[in-house]
């Protein structure tokens, strides 16, 4: 039995199949971890979601910002933006089944035996592992609760609050938790977010660093697997932190990692977008 983690799919199914063939993935015994952003911008968002659903008993998936955007658009079609490739999902006959499965996926997964966490974007440096799991569970509960679901999705958009406060309540509290787990790249040691900077790790504004680079980070004793940040090109010098988004949808590659051995595999992607992997302008 082997367990693999794969970077952002973003609706690119063929590179995923290439990788699973490369390692002779057997869903009867192997397991696949997904860092989120499984849909959007790529050419096969619907096919990708259906394929993952068929493997649902063999995978662990955390939600990314594009996945949450799909759920929000399923409630409010006006949320769709130019460049989204989500409409085919919303018009699919099996839409309800697929979206119900997606909304019940995790915001954060923690494997106690491996002492390894799986998130889409990261964990803010001021949070302990226990705090991060507790906050992730708050968003997961809102997604699973029919009375909170729509209000949460309608209220999750926006950059404020820029920093965590234990006294936050309601939608504002859930929004900053969501932004930490699904949109974060740079922040201060206290967790103040810069959500506008999207380039490489060495381009932080004064007072900011990549979330994983703060010396005071309280999850330094936990291994963390994440995606989201394509400009890192899968490179992270921080021990125990594994970046897996290598910009497939931008014409880069898709990367798969054996989480026990650290061995990586990649399959090249043909970008469906009009530009190749830039340092800027990623979601």
UniProtKB/Swiss-Prot annotation:
Pfam families associated with the record: Metallophos
Xref: CDD domains: MPP_ApaH (cd07422)
Disulfide bonds: none
Catalysed reactions, semicolon-separated: P(1),P(4)-bis(5'-adenosyl) tetraphosphate + H2O = 2 ADP + 2 H(+)
InterPro entries assigned: ApaH, Calcineurin-like_PHP_ApaH, Metallo-depent_PP-like
Keyword check for Methyltransferase: no
Keywords tagged on the record: Hydrolase
EC annotation from Swiss-Prot or TrEMBL: 3.6.1.41
Enzyme class: hydrolase
Molecular function via GO: bis(5'-nucleosyl)-tetraphosphatase (symmetrical) activity
Keyword Hydrolase: yes
Function: Hydrolyzes diadenosine 5',5'''-P1,P4-tetraphosphate to yield ADP.
Stated family: Belongs to the Ap4A hydrolase family.
PANTHER family referenced in this protein's UniProt entry, alphabetically: CYTOCHROME C5, PTHR40942
HAMAP family: ApaH
The protein's name in its UniProt record: Bis(5'-nucleosyl)-tetraphosphatase, symmetrical
Protein species of origin: Pseudomonas fluorescens (strain SBW25)
């Amino acid at each position: 039995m082997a367990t693999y983690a794969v970077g952002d799919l973003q609706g690119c199914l063929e590179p995923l199949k290439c990788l699973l063939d490369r390692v002779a993935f057997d869903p009867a015994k192997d397991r696949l971890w997904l860092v989120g952003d499984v849909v959007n911008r790529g050419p096969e968002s619907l096919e990708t979601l259906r394929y993952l659903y068929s493997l649902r008993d063999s995978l662990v998936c955390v939600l990314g910002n594009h996945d949450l955007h799909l759920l929000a658009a399923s409630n409010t079609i006006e949320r769709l933006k130019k460049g989204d490739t989500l409409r085919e999902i919303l018009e699919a006959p099996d839409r309800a089944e697929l979206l119900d499965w997606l909304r019940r996926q995790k915001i954060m997964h923690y494997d106690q035996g491996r002492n390894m966490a799986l998130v889409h974007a990261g964990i803010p440096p001021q949070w302990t592992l226990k705090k991060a799991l507790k906050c992730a569970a708050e968003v997961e509960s809102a997604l699973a609760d029919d009375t909170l679901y729509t209000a949460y999705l309608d209220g999750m958009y926006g950059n404020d609050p820029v920093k965590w406060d234990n006294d936050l309540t309601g939608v504002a509290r859930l929004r900053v938790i969501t932004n930490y787990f699904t949109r974060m790249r740079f922040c201060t040691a206290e967790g103040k977010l810069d959500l506008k900077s999207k380039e490489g790790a060495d381009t932080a504004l004064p007072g900011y660093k990549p979330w994983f680079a703060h010396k005071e980070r309280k999850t330094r004793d936990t291994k963390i697997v994440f995606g989201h940040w394509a400009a890192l090109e899968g490179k992270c010098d921080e021990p125990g932190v594994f970046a897996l988004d290598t910009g497939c949808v931008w014409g880069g590659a898709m990367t798969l990692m054996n989480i026990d051995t650290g061995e990586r595999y990649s399959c090249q992607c043909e970008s469906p977008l009009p530009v190749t992997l830039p340092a800027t302008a990623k979601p």
